[in-house]
Amino acid sequence: MSVVSVSMPEELLERLDDFADDHGYTGRSEVVREASRNLLGEFEDKKLEGRELMGVVTVVFDYETTTVEEKMMHLRHEHEGLVASNFHSHVGGHHCMELFVLEGSLESISTFVGKIRATKDTLTIDYSVLPVDEFGGLADVS
């Protein structure tokens, strides 16, 4: 097995160690391997390929980190065909929350989420993806 080196803030490392201890992992490497497999598998779900999807992406960042807000604005414009709606809110005193509602293909949503994940200084990124056609019956009710 290859050995890799990963840089992360001390606080995240402490959380990783605590998580490993609390959940019975043998160490950091096992946690990172499982997290990596889960991350890579998130958008490899064959049931979603070729279907129209909707997604919600939530990003939280420190309000003083203006580079993140600028990046979010840039991504919103760069992916205007994908972003159906966008909402910005101030939360918790020192934080901003950016919420994106997306509608598009698995590939386009994957690309968008990947670009957000690559944005430096975000605190949390959360998302969910659902097929639009699963709600077709609800839309037909008169």
Curated annotation (Swiss-Prot):
Q: Which GO terms describe its molecular function?
A: DNA binding; DNA-binding transcription factor activity; nickel cation binding
Q: Which UniProt keywords apply?
A: DNA-binding, Metal-binding, Nickel, Transcription, Transcription regulation
Q: Which CDD domains match?
A: RHH_NikR_HicB-like
Q: Specify the domain of life of the species encoding this protein.
A: Archaea
| Any GO BP | regulation of DNA-templated transcription
Q: Which residues cross the membrane?
A: none
Give a yes or no for keyword Transcription in this entry: yes
* Cofactor(s) of this protein: Ni(2+)
- Per UniProt, Ni(2+) binds at H77, H88, H90, C96
Query: What is the free-text note on the cofactor?
Result: Binds 1 nickel ion per subunit.
Q: What does this protein do?
A: Transcriptional regulator.
> Belongs to which family?
Belongs to the transcriptional regulatory CopG/NikR family.
Describe, as the record does, how this protein assembles with itself and its partners: Homotetramer.
The name of this protein is Putative nickel-responsive regulator
| Natural source organism | Halobacterium salinarum (strain ATCC 700922 / JCM 11081 / NRC-1)
Query: What are the leading ranks of the lineage?
Result: Archaea, Methanobacteriati, Methanobacteriota, Stenosarchaea group, Halobacteria
